Amino acid sequence: MAEAFKFELVSPERLLVSEQVESVVIPGAEGEMTVMAHHAPVMTTIKPGVVTVKTASGGEERYVVFGGFADIVPAGCTLLAESAVAVKDVDRADLARRIQEAKEDAADAKDDQARSKAEQFLSQLTTLEGAILPA
């Protein structure tokens, strides 16, 4: 059994998780990363994706996050999300709205840099949609 550490997932609305966990997989901007006890100190940005939490009791919980930051230290990990919700509580209409807004942002972009950023965000959202919603 892996050693537990403190994990907190915080959104502007509320504290979603504050407990001892075995591991957390977070969608870092440079790729997914697994955090465990005694992890080297890191601060990273979070892209839209799924956070998978393996609890100290052996269960698994999944949360959708829409950007933010993760502060990782040897004793724990705090993820400050721009928006977060449990996968089981995902609102399909809200996700569809976010995807539509991202499509409009890409179409309305004034320059190549803005278009590229909007298209990247749209790609992340559609990948997220495929990962959490059944066909």
Swiss-Prot record:
Signal peptide: none
Main location: membrane
GO MF entries: ATP binding; proton-transporting ATP synthase activity, rotational mechanism
One Pfam assignment: ATP-synt_DE_N
Protein function: Produces ATP from ADP in the presence of a proton gradient across the membrane.
Assembly description: F-type ATPases have 2 components, CF(1) - the catalytic core - and CF(0) - the membrane proton channel. CF(1) has five subunits: alpha(3), beta(3), gamma(1), delta(1), epsilon(1). CF(0) has three main subunits: a, b and c.
Protein family: Belongs to the ATPase epsilon chain family.
Protein name: ATP synthase epsilon chain
Organism classification: Bacteria, Pseudomonadati, Pseudomonadota, Alphaproteobacteria, Hyphomicrobiales
Gene expressing this chain: atpC
